[in-house]
């Protein structure tokens, strides 16, 4: 009987500790009190290890070590650029990271002198690095498959200066596909005809 009572008390204490731990993650603010928002950049494949590293890099959590320990072994996270708002709880952060609801990146660029400059900008803005972007932008076989037949020295003209919304996890190949669509949208038949009348080329 005494052993049963001791076991019951032990289980009650353990349950209370787990409940308190869960309540704390469901009610306390995740961000530091001096921040209104912060961005968490979770690299692929989006496992707990990548989330933990993102939290370390962010330096924006009130109790980063506690959060890192809490998500150890958890799964279902998705890579991306996530906006963490003041007032969000650790539990809400976890749910956001599992939802995949990224905050898009606003990309703005002027006409670039060469593709290396543009690739450098892209490497600073997105998950993929500049080398991957440059390779995709100069992949003549892939460009031909998209109907683009330009010489290497003509390729910078393919990337129309403007503002674009893209996800941080955008693949270099999908970025190039988007730019081809924007190029064709810009150089519509009317604009092409006007350029020809003025003696200009695309």
Region roles according to the model:
Residues 2-202:
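Conserved catalytic or metal-liganding residues and their short signature motifs at active sites
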């Amino acid at each position: 009987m005494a052993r049963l009572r001791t076991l019951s008390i032990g289980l009650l204490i353990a349950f209370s500790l787990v409940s308190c731990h869960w309540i704390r993650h469901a009610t306390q603010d995740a961000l530091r009190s001096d921040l209104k928002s912060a961005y968490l950049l979770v690299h692929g494949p989006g496992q707990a290890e990548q989330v933990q590293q993102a939290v370390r890099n962010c330096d924006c959590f009130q109790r980063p070590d506690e959060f890192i320990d809490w998500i150890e072994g958890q799964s279902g996270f998705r890579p991306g650029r996530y906006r963490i708002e003041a007032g969000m709880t650790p539990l809400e952060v976890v749910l956001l990271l599992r939802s995949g609801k990224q905050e898009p990146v606003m990309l703005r660029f002027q006409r670039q002198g060469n593709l290396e400059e543009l690739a450098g900008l892209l490497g600073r803005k997105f998950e993929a690095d500049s080398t991957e972007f440059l390779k995709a932008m100069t992949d003549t076989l892939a460009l031909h498959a998209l109907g683009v037949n330009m010489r290497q020295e003509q390729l910078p003209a393919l990337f129309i200066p403007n503002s674009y919304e893209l996800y941080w996890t955008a693949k270099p190949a999908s970025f190039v596909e988007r730019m081809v669509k924007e190029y064709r949208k810009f150089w519509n038949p009317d604009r092409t005809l006007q350029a020809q009348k003025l003696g200009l080329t695309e």
